[in-house]
Amino acid sequence: MEAQKLSVEAIEKGTVIDHIPAGRGLTILRQFKLLHYGNAVTVGFNLPSKTQGSKDIIKIKGVCLDDKAADRLALFAPEAVVNTIDNFKVVQKRHLTLPDEIAEVFRCPNPNCAGHGEPVKSRFYVKKHNGQTRLKCHYCEKTYNRDSVAEA
């Protein structure tokens, strides 16, 4: 039997975001500014997956995501798993859950929203509706799909 080979190189210490839906890895890199840490980032796109068919994976050397940051990832990849790595071994495995509320991450797409011209922090309530993630602005109370808010 042939030894199993990793598609993306292992890291000694850091974070692995696994089981990202294929094609969403780049969005997560951009939205969470994962390239701004100054650490090595390894990305695999459209890798084979037994459960998903294909998946993306992100490995960030020397950076450990806290629970709050990990749960924000659920907006883009609810089935992703965040693994904390130490000495090349998984020391913590977190399955993501959608947060009830998210603050200071996105800007409201409504140009008339009070959150635009005022010194207030953005704040959205997160809901699942018909299988889609929806975000309701705390200030203008308009509801948007995840992609509309992410691109604003």
From Swiss-Prot:
Any one cellular-component term (Gene Ontology): aspartate carbamoyltransferase complex
Keyword Mitochondrion: no
Pfam families documented for this protein: PyrI, PyrI_C
Binding of Zn(2+), residues: 108, 113, 137, 140
GO MF assignments: metal ion binding
Cofactor stoichiometry and binding remark: Binds 1 zinc ion per subunit.
Function, as annotated: Involved in allosteric regulation of aspartate carbamoyltransferase.
Protein name: Aspartate carbamoyltransferase regulatory chain
Organism of origin: Neisseria gonorrhoeae (strain ATCC 700825 / FA 1090)
